[in-house]
Amino acid sequence: MRILAILLMASVCGISCSHSTDDFQPEAIVALERGALDRWGKGDPQGFFDIMASEQTYFDPTTAKRIDGQDALKKYIAPFAGKIRIEKVEMIDPKVQRSGDLAVLTFNLVDYGAQMDGGPKTTARWNSTEVYQRLNGSWKIVHSHWSYTKPVLKE
């Protein structure tokens, strides 16, 4: 009887332990991004740096080329730190697609009342792709790509 109980407990532990190692929740990735966006809207870029891998790559409409690594990205972002204010951030239709230790988050973003250094308030509309990788048990951004939604193109 004792052997049967031990085997039963070992089986239950094996099943529950194997289940918990791959307990992926897409909303956890979305929550990481929302938290970073909320801090960014208060002028604090550290929310993004906290969830980025050290070797992250980055594009946005104002970069001349890809930015490689968090140190280079911090230098690029430094002039904006503390100067950006956004009244309301709306993340539209976030979608997380995952394969193994990689997850891709895509969404549209609307920044209402976006203001740079006390200048005029605007509404900014973005497309975003964030590639997350599970590193040492935590999801980190390894690549960011931001573009304007329906940008005005010169002929």
Kindly give the residue locations of the regions a language model identified.
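A beta-strand edge to alpha-helix "cap/lid" segment located at domain peripheries
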Residues: 17-50, 57-155
